[in-house]
Amino acid sequence: MDGITAPISKAGAAKLVKKDFLEALKTNDFGKLKAILIERQIDVDTVFEVEDENMILASYKQGYWLPSYKLKSSWATGLHLSVLLGHVECLMVLLDHNATINCRPNGKTPLHVACEIANLECVKILCDRGAKLNCYSLSGHTALHFCTTPSSILCAKQLVLRGANVNMKTNNQDEETPLHTAAHFGLSELVAFYVENGAIVDSMNAHMETPLAIATYWALRFKEQEYSREHHLICRTLLDNNAEVNARDDDFKSPLHKAAWNCDHVLMHMMLEAGAEANLMDINGCAAIQYVLKVTSVRPAAQPEICYQLLLNHGAARIYPPQFHKVIQACHSCPKAIEVVVNAYEHIRWNIKWRRAIPDDDLEKHWDFYHSLFKVCCNTPRTLMHLSRCAIRKALHNRCHKAIPMLSLPLPLKKYLLLEPEGIIY
């Protein structure tokens, strides 16, 4: 009886059908898929456990902990797999057989997956078939919140044009709108589109941060220490649409504080010109100039002298004179920054802390500048020209940046009044 094959059990047969069904999905064999569904051999919403190391199919609640091996695979229906693999024909077959379009076996609907992988064709099909545009994932994100790459901009536009809510906040501890998300990821085109379609420019997340504050903070790529032009464009767009430049987060930081923390003179200039208050203090009692001072030494791509110049020309309070050695500690390799700050005082005397703050190699490298610094900052008064500059600046106060360029003076004198560094102090 060795040649007789044992009959396949019902469970074994179901297992084989499930395997064939999954194989048809993976190979885009929509003909075979259709035949299986017509014969009703398997439920159209059958859930599979598939490899998903990048968690494209999965979404979890914030704060939940799972062992790493659990995160290497996810549960998914045929719809999710068809979207993930870009198999439009299989997607259509499943929808024609009444697959549940908003199913979330592992926290995401097929529409969430389509937006995350930026598959515009699948987004259109799912929307045409009735997918919920504002449905939350298990992590509390809508489909618009999953549009985080330049390639997904068209997906976001499609959703908005079909009625997705551009002001819907995430249902989690962040409470961010799609505008916050686009600002974070530097999608300037999408930010402009959201604003044109009714996004509230001053919407606040759970930390009371506006999209302007988010874009300002993320304008510095911390790993590369480079500034993002896209984030600068976003800030320009938001300010042009009347974003509140002095909005404060839950630490009382304004966007100017965040720009100062990044030592980003482009954004600092943009915000000061838009009416940012240079002397606003945060919860730590720090104004923007203190943040520039704190980070100057760890921002290699920055031009701190411009940051100080901008703030002082917009009326920022000067560094407390007994603490001036901290300016030298932070800027010892950038004499121009020291020059700008020291020229904001009528007179300031050096002390031993100044000398200790300068490494010997920097002292030697910038000897002419440091020699002039110690020579000028002694017991004798500064030049009459410098004192005249201080008198004019004191009279103009926070209008220096506007008033001085309008004076009938030669350009070199205007630059002198605006603290333009010259490389030496006299």
UniProtKB/Swiss-Prot annotation:
The modification (3S)-3-hydroxyasparagine is found at N246. GO terms for cellular component: Cul2-RING ubiquitin ligase complex; Cul5-RING ubiquitin ligase complex; cytoplasm. Changing L239D: Abolishes interaction with HIF1AN. The keyword Oxidoreductase does not apply. Pathway: Protein modification; protein ubiquitination. Disruption phenotype: Asb4-deletion mice develop normally without detectable gross abnormalities compared to their wild-type littermates. With age, male mutant mice display elevated body weight and fat mass. In contrast, female mice did not exhibit altered body weight, lean mass, or fat mass with age. Asb4-null mice display a full spectrum of preeclampsia-like phenotypes during pregnancy including hypertension, proteinuria, and decreased litter size. Placentas show signs of early differentiation defects and impaired vascularization. Hydroxylation at Asn-246 by HIF1AN may provide an oxygen-dependent regulation mechanism for the function of ASB4 in promoting vascular differentiation. Highest expression detected in testis, with some expression detected in ovary and heart. Not detected in lung, kidney, liver, spleen and bone marrow. Expressed in the developing placental vasculature. The keyword Magnesium does not apply. SUPFAM superfamilies: Ankyrin repeat, SOCS box-like. Its main location: cytoplasm. Interacts with HIF1AN. Component of an ECS (Elongin BC-CUL2/5-SOCS-box protein) E3 ubiquitin-protein ligase complex formed of CUL2 or CUL5, Elongin BC (ELOB and ELOC), RBX1 and ASB4. Interacts with IRS4. Interacts with ID2. Interacts with GPS1. The SOCS box domain mediates the interaction with the Elongin BC complex, an adapter module in different E3 ubiquitin-protein ligase complexes. Belongs to the ankyrin SOCS box (ASB) family. This is Ankyrin repeat and SOCS box protein 4. It comes from Mus musculus (Mouse). The gene is Asb4.
